[in-house]
Amino acid sequence: MSKKSVAQLSAADLEGKRVLVRVDFNVPVDEKGVITDETRIRAALPTIQDLISKGAKVILVSHFGRPKGVDEKLRLTPVAQRLSELLHKPVAKLDDCIGDAVIAHTQAMANGDVCLLENVRFHPGEEKNDPEFAKQLAACAEVYVNDAFGTAHRAHASTAGVTQYLSPCVAGFLMEKELEYLQNAIEHPRRPLAAIVGGSKVSSKIGVIEALLEKVDKLLIGGGMIFTFYKARGLNVGKSLVEEDKLELAKHLETKAQEKGVELLLPTDVVVADNFANDANSQVVSIEAIPDDWMGLDIGPASVKRFQEALQDCKTVIWNGPMGVFEFDQFAKGTEAIARYLAELTSQGVCTIIGGGDSVAAVEKVGVADRMSHISTGGGASLELLEGKQLPGIAALDDA
C-alpha cells in the first residue's frame, strides 16, 4: 500500500502551483491561549520547507480543538504567529477556509508564499465530509498534500473529500515516515517482533491485540487491563479496575496466543494502593496476593525485570499504552523503566516504535523520546493501522 510522496514531486511539478497541505496543528494551549507544546508545528516543517524550496504556493489547513461552529478561542492565529517565527517568513492567517476572500488571497500569492486557513472545523461540513464543502475547500488549490497522520483514520472533507477535486494527491514527509515505520513493522518486521500493550481497558485495545496476535512473536501486556485477565483466571484483584463483560474475551485472547505460538506475558507482581491518589499508601505484592480493599496501579519490579528479559533478543518492538497510572509519580516506575529500556535497546540497533497517545507522553516525560526509532504522531490512527484497517486519509492518496 505504498503511496506517492511529496519527495517524488520535482520543482517542475510544483513551481507556481497552489498546494493545499493538510497539517495537524491541533496543539495544546494554556488558558491564555499560549501554545504549551509546539511539537506538531515543528513536525510539519520539513514538508512546508520542501514545498517552499520547490516554488509552490503553500496553503495550510488544520483543525484545532472541537469547536461547534465559530469559536473565537479556537482561531489559529497563535499557530500562524509561531509558524512564521519557525519559518523565518510571514505566514498570512486567513479569516476563513472557504469563500471568495480565500480564493482571492490564494490567487494573489507569489511562489514560496505561505498562508494558513482558519480552523476547518468551524464548518460542520468538515467532519461530515460534505462533498459541497470539500469542493469549496479544494477551490483555492491545484495539488494536495496530506501530512496529518493523526487524522488519517477520519474520513473528513480536508483528509478525504478534497482529493476528488485535486491532483496529484500525495503524502507529506511526516505521513510517509509513519507509513514506512508502522507498515514495515507489521508487514516486514525484523524478528523476533514484540508488542507491548498497556492502558486501562481491554475494550479499547481488543482490535489491536487480536491483530497483533497474528503477527508478533511476543506480546507483553501491562496497565489496568491486566486485572481483567487475572479475574478471568480466577484470581482475586481487590478493587482494581475490571471490565466484567470482557472476562470471556480475556480467556479467548490467552487461548488464541497459545494456539498461535505467541509468548503472552502478564506481570507477576503489581504495585497496589489503598486509594486512587498520588499520596496513597502502596506496597508491592504478587498477583496471587492482592488485598481485598486495595487496587493495582502499576506493574511491580519483578515484572519489569521479566519484561526486559523477554525483550532482550527482540529486533523490533512496538509499544502502545502505559504500564500503570503514570500521571502519578509513585505509580510511574513501571512505565518509566520500560521507556528507558527501549531507549537502551534502540542504541543496540533494535527498531523501537512508540505508537501514539500516552506512551508518547511517557517517553517524553522520561526524556528519551529522541532515542526511539520512531514516535508515532497519531494515537487512534496508529492503532487502526496496526490493526490492519484501511485509513480513509491514506486510501485517498495516489498510489506510488
From Swiss-Prot:
<feature type="binding site">
    <location>
        <begin position="24"/>
        <end position="26"/>
    </location>
    <ligand>
        <name>substrate</name>
    </ligand>
</feature>
<feature type="binding site">
    <location>
        <position position="40"/>
    </location>
    <ligand>
        <name>substrate</name>
    </ligand>
</feature>
<dbReference type="InterPro" id="IPR015824">
    <property type="entry name" value="Phosphoglycerate_kinase_N"/>
</dbReference>
<keyword id="KW-0067">ATP-binding</keyword>
<dbReference type="Pfam" id="PF00162">
    <property type="entry name" value="PGK"/>
</dbReference>
<keyword id="KW-0547">Nucleotide-binding</keyword>
<dbReference type="GO" id="GO:0004618">
    <property type="term" value="F:phosphoglycerate kinase activity"/>
</dbReference>
<keyword id="KW-0808">Transferase</keyword>
<dbReference type="InterPro" id="IPR015911">
    <property type="entry name" value="Phosphoglycerate_kinase_CS"/>
</dbReference>
<keyword id="KW-0324">Glycolysis</keyword>
<dbReference type="GO" id="GO:0043531">
    <property type="term" value="F:ADP binding"/>
</dbReference>
<dbReference type="GO" id="GO:0006096">
    <property type="term" value="P:glycolytic process"/>
</dbReference>
<feature type="binding site">
    <location>
        <position position="154"/>
    </location>
    <ligand>
        <name>substrate</name>
    </ligand>
</feature>
<dbReference type="InterPro" id="IPR001576">
    <property type="entry name" value="Phosphoglycerate_kinase"/>
</dbReference>
<dbReference type="GO" id="GO:0005524">
    <property type="term" value="F:ATP binding"/>
</dbReference>
<keyword id="KW-0963">Cytoplasm</keyword>
<dbReference type="InterPro" id="IPR036043">
    <property type="entry name" value="Phosphoglycerate_kinase_sf"/>
</dbReference>
<feature type="binding site">
    <location>
        <begin position="356"/>
        <end position="359"/>
    </location>
    <ligand>
        <name>ATP</name>
    </ligand>
</feature>
<dbReference type="GO" id="GO:0005829">
    <property type="term" value="C:cytosol"/>
</dbReference>
<comment type="pathway">
    <text>Carbohydrate degradation; glycolysis; pyruvate from D-glyceraldehyde 3-phosphate: step 2/5.</text>
</comment>
<feature type="binding site">
    <location>
        <position position="327"/>
    </location>
    <ligand>
        <name>ATP</name>
    </ligand>
</feature>
<keyword id="KW-0418">Kinase</keyword>
<dbReference type="GO" id="GO:0006094">
    <property type="term" value="P:gluconeogenesis"/>
</dbReference>
<comment type="similarity">
    <text>Belongs to the phosphoglycerate kinase family.</text>
</comment>
<feature type="binding site">
    <location>
        <position position="296"/>
    </location>
    <ligand>
        <name>ATP</name>
    </ligand>
</feature>
<feature type="binding site">
    <location>
        <begin position="63"/>
        <end position="66"/>
    </location>
    <ligand>
        <name>substrate</name>
    </ligand>
</feature>
<feature type="binding site">
    <location>
        <position position="205"/>
    </location>
    <ligand>
        <name>ATP</name>
    </ligand>
</feature>
<feature type="binding site">
    <location>
        <position position="121"/>
    </location>
    <ligand>
        <name>substrate</name>
    </ligand>
</feature>
<protein>
    <recommendedName>
        <fullName>Phosphoglycerate kinase</fullName>
        <ecNumber>2.7.2.3</ecNumber>
    </recommendedName>
</protein>
<comment type="subunit">
    <text>Monomer.</text>
</comment>
